[in-house]
Amino acid sequence: MSDFFHSDVLSVSELNAFAKSILENHLAGLWIAGEVSNLTRAASGHYYFSLKDSRAQVRCAMFKGAAARLAQPLKEGDHIEVAGKISIYEARGEFQITVNEVRLKGLGQLYEAYERLKAQLQAEGAFAAERKKPLPVRPQCIGIVTSLAAAALRDVVTTLKRRAPEIPVIVYPAAVQGAGSGFQIAQAIKTASQRAECDVLIVCRGGGSIEDLRAFNEEPVVRAIEACTIPVVSGVGHETDFTLADFVADVRAPTPTGAAELVSPNRQESLHRLVQAQGRLKTVLEQRYFDASQKLDWLARQIRHPRQKLDEQRASIGKLAQTLSYSMTQNLRAHTARFERQTQALQHCRPDVSVYRQDIVRLQTALPAAFSRLLARRRQSLTAQAALLEAVSPQHILERGFSVVKNTRGQVIRNADVLKQGQKLHITFSDGETDVRVSKEQGQQDLFDCI
């Protein structure tokens, strides 16, 4: 561990990398069995699913290249065996299997070979319906390919003797299980085809496991049936058993006994089927006659005279006219009632003009007297304010014997101390004005010299 990491304390990424290395280096080449669940197929063609058993599950990813090699698409609930790289997705620390190979659980390579050959034959058209040969209605001779010791042979012969004892039977013996059985079956079919002694050939054996039925899934047997010039009926195993021989045969029977019944006519059954067919035909004809009669009656009821249709239209127009008249009358009444209500409301809202007229006359009479009184008060106030203004006016003060002395700059002289000898002054009296000059050589009463 010290060679892989630089510290005894691992980071999460180091732990995941270490676990991934252990899994990939020590768990290679394993096959894991389980049930498919949570299956998702992405648009890219990849599969993502879980493989589970009764106690645990593991996430699996199967990429497009491996998925293309599947014999058939995976389905939810499939019991399979997978092989691939067992690893950890480091980013999330999730244990997963990157699947490279898949096979059905319990079948392994045998089932894979079956599916590969089936896909190949299907691609070649070996199972196509158009290459199937019809069975003869009444064969002159029936051939059987099976083991002489097989119970299936006894079942087939017993059925043929019961149903068509007059038809001869030829058996082409071959082992139907074990080593070399596929080759023997193929040779027996080829022999029957070459001799052309029979009109139809039954290839059959009893039921068994897929291993027991292995010979009927081998390519030599399938190719021999495909190349056979005689119509071949397969009766291999039970109804639930399907082999490649069943797919390539001209007709597949669920059992060996069923194959014998298919190729042998039964006079009593044929007569019975004929009677049944006659009964069914009669029933069908009677039902068709009854249906046609009902349809004819219905069509007859649908056909009406033009006058009847015109009367219906006239009645409809009359009804519409009545409805329109009634609607207009109701509308007019509603508007009239509304107009009357609004007229009454307007009358209640109209003011009493006579009352307002009396108020106007009274106000017109009182207005001149009020205006005269207001004017007298305004004149009296104006006279008082004029007298007050006159009393404090400069002109009135001058008339009382005062004068105003100003220097050459127009400033009023209020104190004699600011005067200088020879200073020019301007004096304003109530009735005129004059210019003087200051002279200190005289007494105060002669302070100024007239200029």
Curated annotation (Swiss-Prot):
Q: What is its EC number?
A: 3.1.11.6
Location within or outside the cell: Cytoplasm
GO-annotated biological processes: DNA catabolic process
Entry's family note: Belongs to the XseA family.
Which HAMAP family does its entry note? Exonuc_7_L
Protein species of origin: Neisseria gonorrhoeae (strain ATCC 700825 / FA 1090)
State any single GO MF term: nucleic acid binding
Provide this UniProt record's keywords sorted from A to Z: Cytoplasm, Exonuclease, Hydrolase, Nuclease
What reaction is this protein's catalytic activity? Exonucleolytic cleavage in either 5'- to 3'- or 3'- to 5'-direction to yield nucleoside 5'-phosphates
The job of this chain, per UniProt, is described as: Bidirectionally degrades single-stranded DNA into large acid-insoluble oligonucleotides, which are then degraded further into small acid-soluble oligonucleotides.
| A single cellular component GO annotation | cytoplasm
Q: How does it assemble?
A: Heterooligomer composed of large and small subunits.
* Pfam families with a match to the protein in the record: Exonuc_VII_L, tRNA_anti_2
Q: What is this protein called?
A: Exodeoxyribonuclease 7 large subunit
